[in-house]
């Protein structure tokens, strides 16, 4: 990945999407 921070945000967004 490019940046860990960006990856974290992406993961968080994906998790939120999956949860919803």
UniProtKB/Swiss-Prot annotation:
Organism: Cupiennius salei (American wandering spider)
Cellular compartments annotated: Secreted
Keywords for this protein: Secreted, Toxin
Signal peptide: none
Top-level taxon: Eukaryota
Tissue: Expressed by the venom gland.
One CC-aspect GO term: extracellular region
DNA repair is among the record's keywords: no
Family affiliation: Belongs to the cationic peptide 04 (cupiennin) family. 06 subfamily.
Annotated protein name in UniProt: Cupiennin-6f
An MF annotation (GO) of this entry: toxin activity
